[in-house]
Amino acid sequence: MPRFAEQQLYIGGQYVAASSGQTFDSINPATGEVLAKVQRASQADVDRAVASAAEGQKVWAAMTAMQRSRILRRAVDILRERNDELAELETLDTGKPLSETRYVDIVTGADVLEYYAGLIPAIEGEQIPLRESSFVYTRREPLGVVAGIGAWNYPIQIALWKSAPALAAGNAMIFKPSEVTSLTALKLAEIYTEAGLPAGVFNVLTGSGREVGQWLTEHPGIEKVSFTGGTVTGKKVMASASSSSLKEVTMELGGKSPLIVFEDADLDRAADIAVMANFYSSGQVCTNGTRVFVPRMLQARFEAKVLERVKRIRLGDPLDDATNFGPLVSYAHMESVLGYIEKGRSEGARLLIGGTRVSDGDYAKGAYVAPTVFTDCRDDMTIVREEIFGPVMSILIYDSEEEVIRRANDTDYGLAAGVVTRDLNRAHRVIHKLEAGICWINTWGESPAEMPVGGYKQSGVGRENGLVTLGHYTRIKSVQVELGGYSSVF
């Protein structure tokens, strides 16, 4: 019997039954336990949610900036009060350790909501003088109803990253979480309602991307789609959104990010960064630095330091506070990652550690894969070219700065990049040549609310977080005012 009651859709400020009559299972990837039956939205439910959002958006947009700001700040307070219970639910649903969800997922999501709540009164237009008798002013107006489509690795954080700027700008949002991890997005909807958000301004539709996601991207009542997920799916979403009604899109997609260690680097720091950039969240982070470039002269020393740290990783029950490495999100994803590991072996990469499923005792019930490090990798290997989205580090050896920059950029992706060096002149010089939207110097992975997040090339379109993102959720109206006479040519 499932641990939780059957999960309904959230439309118009309340839970409602899906008209499809169908459900799917939410599975705990650490144990195989069915957490809940989750209702599958139908196309009629999408229509119902869009209609509810359109009505709610009118009420929301008519409120003053300070009224909207206070409601979102109240939601921030509730999120922080319920941090621990939300973190436990996120851990059950994703398999991520409590040591992570308790201090990152809800905390950073609430930070983003607080950031945008504070910016609401600053959404303003311009006044442009033309001549003594005439001027132009601009208004930043909300788009209306927008859709957010989330990924399974950071469910509530992504829901907050997408909804915070959208709601701050006066829009309503219909959010579709990944069918793999749907539970905390529904809790977020409850919190928004409790905080005073008008009915319909934040709706949650659960179901598959192939169905619900596509219906949202095609719906004529939706003005924008913000999607987080894989590049292949992102291309489909973008094509559907543009062909249906020229919707605006924001895409945060895949990555195969380079981490470059230079010969003057503090090797202990470099190894710490490399391990964090590959094994945090069991490697299921889009910005992970999975291509680790190391100077030939440092290869043996660097590998030894990485191995020392990987052996300290505490794989275990994600509900145990001592655990810092949990299972992958699902059995299907585990099989995908194991397939890539086998590819690495068959294509000639040298395995330093890991490379197997962990199936001793109770671990056999879960989707556990050991932290894996390959070295002597080549740029043409599958594990180097394709996004694995799992705990697999590829070490590549280089001989010159010019060479490593060229090879680091030799990818279809451009989400993130980083360098480790004591020479800040070199750090900035190299970073400015790397084709990536998010870059780190002597660190990795932090994405504060103030920092725009997004990729180059096939890693995305537009940005999330930061001041710039508010512009993605408004449209500019230009108004000319003439105070003097008017002369017709006719």
From Swiss-Prot:
Residues of the site described as Seems to be a necessary countercharge to the potassium cations: E248
Positions carrying Cysteine sulfenic acid (-SOH): C286
Region forming the signal peptide: none
Encoding gene per record: betB
Protein name, per record: Betaine aldehyde dehydrogenase
Cofactor binding summary note: Binds 2 potassium ions per subunit.
Binding site for K(+) 1: S26, I27, D93, V180
Keywords: Metal-binding, NAD, NADP, Oxidation, Oxidoreductase, Potassium
GO terms under biological process: glycine betaine biosynthetic process from choline
Record-stated family: Belongs to the aldehyde dehydrogenase family.
Domain of life from the UniProt record: Bacteria
Active site: K162 (charge relay system), E252 (proton acceptor), C286 (nucleophile), E464 (charge relay system)
Residues annotated for NAD(+) binding in this entry: G150, A151, W152, K176, P177, S178, E179, G230, T231, V232, T233, G254, C286, E387
Oligomer and partners: Dimer of dimers.
Molecular functions per Gene Ontology: betaine-aldehyde dehydrogenase (NAD+) activity; metal ion binding
Functional description taken from the UniProt entry: Involved in the biosynthesis of the osmoprotectant glycine betaine. Catalyzes the irreversible oxidation of betaine aldehyde to the corresponding acid.
Pathway(s) annotated for this protein in UniProt: Amine and polyamine biosynthesis; betaine biosynthesis via choline pathway; betaine from betaine aldehyde: step 1/1
Binding site for K(+) 2: L246, K457, G460
Enzyme Commission number, as recorded: 1.2.1.8
Bridged cysteine pairs (disulfide): none
Catalytic reaction equation(s): betaine aldehyde + NAD(+) + H2O = glycine betaine + NADH + 2 H(+)
Cofactor(s) needed by this chain: K(+)
